[in-house]
Amino acid sequence: MLARLLGRLGQSVLVLLVVSMVSFLVFRYIGDPTVSLLGEDASVAEREALLHELGFDQSVPVQYAGYLKQVLSGHFGISYRFRQPVTEVIASRVPATVELSLAAALFAVVGGVGLGVYTAMRRRSLVSRTIMGVSLVGVSLPTFLIGIGLIYLFSVELKWLPAFGRGTLVDVGGWQTGLLTVSGLSALVLPAITLGFFKLTLIMRLVRTEMLDVLRSDYIRFARARGLRNATLYGRHALRNTLIPVITIIGLQLGSLIAFAIVTETVFQWPGLGLLFITSIQGVDVPVISAYLLMIGLLYVGINLVVDLLYAWADPRLRRR
């Protein structure tokens, strides 16, 4: 187990180095910082002075080493658009994206696992067939179209839920949250469903497929022949062995929620990292773009590591290796 952990840590470091190189190339070669910071009317001397201050007149290896040093110290430069440190700009948007992603993850995991188990246990019922039919919508339709449809139904026609924004926020130790207000919770419903719906249908279909395979196995037939109750049979034996092979896929899918939040946040004008990334691309705010890419890479590496550990915990055979 320790050797497996050390091996995964080594792989994670290598992946992060590659991501940092890509982030550095974006930071160095996309856009012109002199135009963004000084404007088009700046003189040649002013441009050269700024390039010297930013270190762009040095060799590429020296610049990359300096970039790594800045990243490790938590400094990503100054946002061209906001004229603030990138860390402050990103930190102000983190609560919105984290709350949206957690709500979508909860919706996807609880709904996906629950519906997957139900449709496997009652696979011939009309309800199960209806659920499987509806799941095709989540797999087929793009996220932005689902979001627009929910906005039209629940915001325009029924007027039950807001169509954009986060609602009323409360400051809790510097964390701007909408989870403590009614308007904040109501504003979270549609974006969370939109972001998590595809993941829910994917998890549901995966769990259903694995559950059906487990229920056909010999040890389940033997347990049923011994007279075990259905609650024990499904909950203790079938479900545990069903989740082992899908833990990795579920973890990776949930890890992509923050990255996929770009579309959802744009549709609902949710003031999170995804919307910040889109506006940064439109405004060629390269430091923010670079920091966002590096952060997403770090997130994926961290989630992969956690998923591997969970997989080893769930499967005793891996713990003995």
PLM features: residue spans?
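Alpha-helical transmembrane segments of integral membrane proteins
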Residues: 2-4, 16, 94-127, 143, ...
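Hydrophobic secretory-pathway targeting helix
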Residues: 2-22
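Residue-level recognition of pore/gate-forming positions within transmembrane alpha-helices
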Residues: 12, 20, 43, 108-109, ...
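Hydrophobic alpha-helical transmembrane segments of membrane transport/permease proteins
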Residues: 15-65, 154, 158-180
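Membrane-water interface segments at the C-terminal ends of transmembrane alpha-helices
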Residues: 22-30, 58, 67-69, 134-165, ...
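Short hydrophobic, aromatic-rich alpha-helical segments embedded in or entering the lipid bilayer
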Residues: 44-75, 220, 269-280
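An internal, D/E-rich "acidic patch" concept
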Residues: 57-113
